[in-house]
């Protein structure tokens, strides 16, 4: 039975895991572990010759190819933003799909079997558009996405499996590269894992800290040299990499050296950056960012109807929670020390893998009850957002409410679905709109229109409206600008497959060029060693062909390479045959003389010779 893998599709780094023989195991990346601590950085790059790179190779070449490199695409999920790379445009779903495609390939290499099913995590505070975009990305990558689950819930699954026992109320503080989620979860003795509330900020994370460090370095340089390095994309990428490395180092050391030679060139010559960033300075820079975590913590406690003192465990998830200042700030605010035993960088992927094993029936003692993070409403008269499903409602869920018309003889109503906590529809996120037509004409207030919201286990919403008098029914598959149609998904799947085919062809090309180089070398060696056993005309002709082959290799002219390889192989084979026949003829002549000698000497004995060991 094939496995369902768990995927942590992160802003800065991504990881995957799988349950093998009941034990969650992180799937290694083909390039090894990145500095971020997860399997690989969430980078995608396109070279000028059309090659696509994902992960560490994409990150390594970012400085030389800033225009072709994309990172932090997750922050654009659920928007209509397009990444422009040279003469092409890509949606956030496509970029995420390329990352997921790499994970699929790594998982198949690790498990030695096809991997087609996945559980993918999202920040708990992702709205419906963002969740649907994530699911679309998985489909484009070739996955059957069995479940979309919240990252803190996944982390709690990892925790719950390891620490089943007495009932606990756990606050999961998940601070990743681009998002913050604060989730309060109750784990009972079974263990049941029930989400009580969730809150967060989809625009708060480690990348904001990196940006604060970048601004500090850039401002200092601008003050000294009068140049804003942030306007130079190549210099900016170097600054960003240096900032991230310093941030990571300062989790375990008190100072970090930043050394960026030749960061730019002016009329007076090359300019360099050489400075030391202390942990104290880092804490000063990130303090305004860290202070923003209080509001989501308070909101999560309010949603769960709990006080700080009700929390029995604090669980940290995400790379930035390794920063001592972040840990101390949250621990001091809640008045509780964080639990150990869960790797902040692996917990989400492991939890997703556990959920996959639950869906497969491999793990049977976990019941997961998640919640919808934001209130789902319809727009009613005056632009009011009328709630249908409140925030922190356990999912899956189906709820209905009856509405009526606002005007006499109204035969059409517009159902506008929004998500958020603001009282006016215009201030919330619009998820979609549709019309219910054919309503029986009647005075206003008489028709009864039943609107039903249905959220599945992935947290994805479907809405229907029914006129109770006529039975007329209309449904919606969310038509926000970021939702992809089936045709668009299929087109993007084909594009993703084309890149996979491109990778295969690139590998094939490299292997052919390597074989051609080996052939050129071995032929030259053979002809040189043959000496006068090969006539000069033949030798010169073949060496000329080898010269042409080397030129074709250099130019990567694959048609010429293949043609010349075939010709040279045939020619050298003929040379070899002639040399063998010549040697054989000489041997036979020698053998004839030996036979004559044998006939003359009756004492000669035929024997088999064994080589001395």
Curated annotation (Swiss-Prot):
Concerning Gene3D superfamilies, the annotation shows: 1.20.1270.10, 3.30.420.40, Actin, Chain A, domain 4, Substrate Binding Domain Of DNAk, Chain A, domain 1
- Which family does this protein fall into? Belongs to the heat shock protein 70 family.
Instruction: Give the classification, highest ranks.
Output: Archaea, Methanobacteriati, Thermoplasmatota, Thermoplasmata, Thermoplasmatales
Q: Kindly give the SUPFAM superfamilies that the UniProt entry links to this protein.
A: Actin-like ATPase domain, Heat shock protein 70kD (HSP70), C-terminal subdomain, Heat shock protein 70kD (HSP70), peptide-binding domain
Q: Tell me the keywords, alphabetical order.
A: ATP-binding, Chaperone, Nucleotide-binding, Stress response
Would I find Membrane among this entry's keywords?
no
Organism, as annotated = Thermoplasma volcanium (strain ATCC 51530 / DSM 4299 / JCM 9571 / NBRC 15438 / GSS1)
List compositional bias (Low complexity) regions by residue number.
581-597
Q: InterPro entries in the record, alphabetically?
A: ATPase_NBD, Chaperone_DnaK, Heat_shock_70_CS, HSP70_C_sf, HSP70_peptide-bd_sf, Hsp_70_fam
Instruction: Write down a Pfam family by its short name.
Output: HSP70
Disordered: where is this region?
A: 579-613
Query: What PROSITE patterns does the entry give?
Result: HSP70_1 (PS00297), HSP70_2 (PS00329), HSP70_3 (PS01036)
UniProt lists compositionally biased (Basic and acidic residues) regions at: 599-613
Name of the protein in question = Chaperone protein DnaK
Named from the GO MF annotations, one term is: ATP binding
Q: Write down the superkingdom of origin.
A: Archaea
Annotated function: Acts as a chaperone.
List, alphabetically, the PANTHER family matched: HEAT SHOCK PROTEIN 70KDA
């Amino acid at each position: 039975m094939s496995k369902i893998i768990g995927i942590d599709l992160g802003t800065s780094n991504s990881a995957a895991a799988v349950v093998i023989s009941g034990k969650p195991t992180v799937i290694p990346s083909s390039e090894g572990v990145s500095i971020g601590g997860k399997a690989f950085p969430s980078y995608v790059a396109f070279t000028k010759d059309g090659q696509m790179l994902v992960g560490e190779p994409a990150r390594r070449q970012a400085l030389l190819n800033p225009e072709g490199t994309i990172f932090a695409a997750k922050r654009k999920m659920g928007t209509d933003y397009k990444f422009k790379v040279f003469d092409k445009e890509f949606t956030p779903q496509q970029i995420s799909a390329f990352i997921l495609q790499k994970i699929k390939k790594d998982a198949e290499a690790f498990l030695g079997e096809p991997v087609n099913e996945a559980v993918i995590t999202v920040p708990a505070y992702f709205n419906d558009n963002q969740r649907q975009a994530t699911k679309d990305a998985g489909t484009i990558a070739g996955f059957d996405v069995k479940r979309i689950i919240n990252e803190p819930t996944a982390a709690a699954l990892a925790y719950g499996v390891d620490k089943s026992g007495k009932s606990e109320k756990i606050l999961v503080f998940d601070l990743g590269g681009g998002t913050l989620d604060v989730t309060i979860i109750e784990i009972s003795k079974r263990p049941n894992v029930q989400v009580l509330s969730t809150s967060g900020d989809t625009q708060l994370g480690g990348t904001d800290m990196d940006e604060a460090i970048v601004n500090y370095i850039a401002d200092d340089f601008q003050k000294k040299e009068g140049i804003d390095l942030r306007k130079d994309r190549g210099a900016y990428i170097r600054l960003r990499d240096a900032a991230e490395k310093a941030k990571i180092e300062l989790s375990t050391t008190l100072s970090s050296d930043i050394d960026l030679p030749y960061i730019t060139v002016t009329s007076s010559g090359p300019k360099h950056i050489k400075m030391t960033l202390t942990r104290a300075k880092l804490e000063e820079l990130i303090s305004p960012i860290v202070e923003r975590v209080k509001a989501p913590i308070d909101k999560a406690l309010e949603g769960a109807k709990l006080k700080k003192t009700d929390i029995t465990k604090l669980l940290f998830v995400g790379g930035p929670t390794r920063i001592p200042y972040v840990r101390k700030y949250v621990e001091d605010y809640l008045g509780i020390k964080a639990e150990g035993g869960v790797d902040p960088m692996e917990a989400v992927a492991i939890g997703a893998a556990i959920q996959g094993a639950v869906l497969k029936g491999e793990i049977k003692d976990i019941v997961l009850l998640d919640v919808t993070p934001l209130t789902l409403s319809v727009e009613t008269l005056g632009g009011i957002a009328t709630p249908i499903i409140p925030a922190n409602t356990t999912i899956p869920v189906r709820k209905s409410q009856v509405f009526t018309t606002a005007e006499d003889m109204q035969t059409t109503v517009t159902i506008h679905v929004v998500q958020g906590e603001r009282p006016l529809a215009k201030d919330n996120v619009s998820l979609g709109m549709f019309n219910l037509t054919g309503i029986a004409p009647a005075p206003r207030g008489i028709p009864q229109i039943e609107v039903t919201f249905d959220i599945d286990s992935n947290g994805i919403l479907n809405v229907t409206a029914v006129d109770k008098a006529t039975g007329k029914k209309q449904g919606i598959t969310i038509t926000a600008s970021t939702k992809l149609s089936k045709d668009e998904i299929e087109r993007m799947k084909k594009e993703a497959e084309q890149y996979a085919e491109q990778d295969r062809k690139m590998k094939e090309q490299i292997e052919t060029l390597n074989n051609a180089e080996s052939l050129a070398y071995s032929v030259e060696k053979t002809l040189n060693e043959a000496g006068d056993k090969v006539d000069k005309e033949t030798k010169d002709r073949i060496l000329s062909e080898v010269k042409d082959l080397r030129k074709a290799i250099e130019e990567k002219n694959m048609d010429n390479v293949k043609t010349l390889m075939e010709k040279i192989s045939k020619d050298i084979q003929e040379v070899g045959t002639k040399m063998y026949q010549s040697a054989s003829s000489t041997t036979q002549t020698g053998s004839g003389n030996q036979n004559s000698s044998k006939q003359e000497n009756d004492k000669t004995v035929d024997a088999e010779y064994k080589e001395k060991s």
